[in-house]
From Swiss-Prot:
The nucleosome is a histone octamer containing two molecules each of H2A, H2B, H3 and H4 assembled in one H3-H4 heterotetramer and two H2A-H2B heterodimers. The octamer wraps approximately 147 bp of DNA. Core component of nucleosome. Nucleosomes wrap and compact DNA into chromatin, limiting DNA accessibility to the cellular machineries which require DNA as a template. Histones thereby play a central role in transcription regulation, DNA repair, DNA replication and chromosomal stability. DNA accessibility is regulated via a complex set of post-translational modifications of histones, also called histone code, and nucleosome remodeling. Can be acetylated to form H2BK6ac and H2BK33ac. Monoubiquitinated by BRE1 to form H2BK143ub1 and deubiquitinated by UBP26. Required for heterochromatic histone H3 di- and trimethylation at H3K4me. May give a specific tag for epigenetic transcriptional activation. CDD domains: HFD_H2B. Keywords: Acetylation, Chromosome, DNA-binding, Isopeptide bond, Nucleosome core, Nucleus, Ubl conjugation. This is Histone H2B.6. It is found in: Nucleus; Chromosome. Belongs to the histone H2B family. Residues 1-28, 36-53 have a biased composition (Basic and acidic residues). Residues 1-60 are annotated as: Disordered. The modification N6-acetyllysine is found at residues 7, 37.
Length: 153
């Protein structure tokens, strides 16, 4: 901060070197609050100097949720019923939890069978192992239907 204060008086009176040095010693005491006020502007200048980094949105990562899909299924099943944000958050957490369990089980199955790839067969077996009874049967049939629809289109 002090070099900035020395440059200003020197620029005004280049012929007088000694008085400029004396003024430079006196100037920092009076100009320090101004320099401190300039710090946020200085940060902005640094930000503009790093235009690429400051221009990009650094903060928020995209968080993938199932909220849209939960809402669509709710409207298919019960068109007249709504859902609170807390209930939606619980449902989203539930689906994430089930997805993680299925993925972990499918990965274990692939490792046991010494296969490098998780296929629909591992997913189907994981569903049968993770989900209980009738729920597993319905999930397998819906999954098979979805896969055949996807491959046919």
């Amino acid at each position: 901060m002090a070099p900035k204060a020395e440059k200003k008086p020197a620029a005004k009176k280049p012929a007088e070197e000694e008085p400029a040095a004396e003024k430079a010693e006196k100037a920092p005491a009076g100009k320090k609050p101004k320099a401190e006020k300039r710090l946020p502007a200085g940060k902005g200048e640094k930000g503009s100097g790093e235009g690429k980094k400051a221009g990009r949105k650094k903060g928020k990562k995209s968080v993938e949720t199932y909220k849209i899909y939960i809402f669509k299924v709710l409207k298919q099943v019960h068109p007249d019923i709504g859902i609170s944000s807390k209930a939606m958050s619980i449902m989203n957490s539930f689906i994430n939890d089930i997805f993680e369990k299925l993925a972990a089980e499918a990965a274990k199955l692939a490792r046991y069978n010494k296969k490098p790839t998780i296929t629909s067969r591992e997913i189907q077996t994981a569903v049968r192992l993770v989900l209980p009874g009738e729920l597993a049967k319905h999930a397998v049939s819906e999954g098979t239907k979805a896969v055949t629809k996807f491959t046919s289109s």
